């Protein structure tokens, strides 16, 4: 539920205004002056809320909703209760997001946790650091020597920006984040508790496990978003690179020397081992593990909880443990299930009729 305690209320909108913004058709134009004050899910919506319907799993919620208006496809508009104004649109969820972004700009990026303006008195900023106009630094943040931070950026409480780091304009660094040995572009969102630029896990394994110096950097290009608790190791010799527009979920590990292409999507708890390469527009489901030194080609997709030990060609869908093309993986699963149902997979019987021992 949207709370005015956390998100500032925006001016109300008429249904005619919403239809124009979302490129929807208001089925009953006489309701064009009807006022909507917010958004909500169908089961929580009231008469002043806008909702949307797209998934048949939520038919019951639609039939019982108290929403004032609903975005819906032509195919499903007959399911909308008579008291709910109908906004016909090709993609209800996209239209809903368009309106949500319009009225809740404050929810698009993490802002100052203290609603601060300027630099908090308890922040520590080195004399050689250079901050452009409009930078916000929350309490107890530390900005090191030779750091550069662009206009409109926000540094959250308790964060540490180490010596020489460059952060572009309109960036947000969440509370309790550490950044070192990194160059960061514009409009980058780093959520709370991230650690970027620490050395990678690289040793010459012997009785004493000799540590290998990691002297590379982390390069984060424009419009990247990094979820809470994610760690990005700096490169050993070459840089760790996260490409433009890539979105990374919470608790992802990015190893040293990893190269992630543009506009990739990486879901929670993925582990990317050192020196691997993701092409552009790659999608990894949650808890995917990728082996070191492999390449996943442009546009490839990996199913959640898969383990990738071999390179994946561009545009293919792989899954499983170990990952393989999904059609092959599904065929193997079906074959095993058939064997089990037929009894072919049962343990052999010994001469006395008891199950044979398994070594």
From Swiss-Prot:
GO terms for biological process: lipid A biosynthetic process. Its EC number is 2.3.1.191. The active site is at residue 256. Pathway: Bacterial outer membrane biogenesis; LPS lipid A biosynthesis. SUPFAM superfamilies: Trimeric LpxA-like enzymes. One of its GO terms (molecular function) is N-acyltransferase activity. GO terms for cellular component: membrane. Transmembrane segments: none annotated. InterPro entries: Hexapep (IPR001451), Hexapep_transf_CS (IPR018357), LpxD (IPR007691), Trimer_LpxA-like_sf (IPR011004), UDP_GlcNAc_AcTrfase_non-rep (IPR020573). Keywords: Acyltransferase, Lipid A biosynthesis, Lipid biosynthesis, Lipid metabolism, Repeat, Transferase. It is an enzyme of class 2 (transferase). PROSITE patterns: HEXAPEP_TRANSFERASES (PS00101). CDD domains: LbH_LpxD. It comes from the Bacteria. It catalyses: a UDP-3-O-[(3R)-3-hydroxyacyl]-alpha-D-glucosamine + a (3R)-hydroxyacyl-[ACP] = a UDP-2-N,3-O-bis[(3R)-3-hydroxyacyl]-alpha-D-glucosamine + holo-[ACP] + H(+). It holds the Pfam family Hexapep_2. Homotrimer. Belongs to the transferase hexapeptide repeat family. LpxD subfamily. PANTHER family: UDP-3-O-ACYLGLUCOSAMINE N-ACYLTRANSFERASE, UDP-3-O-ACYLGLUCOSAMINE N-ACYLTRANSFERASE 1, MITOCHONDRIAL-RELATED. Catalyzes the N-acylation of UDP-3-O-acylglucosamine using 3-hydroxyacyl-ACP as the acyl donor. Is involved in the biosynthesis of lipid A, a phosphorylated glycolipid that anchors the lipopolysaccharide to the outer membrane of the cell. This is UDP-3-O-acylglucosamine N-acyltransferase. The gene is lpxD.
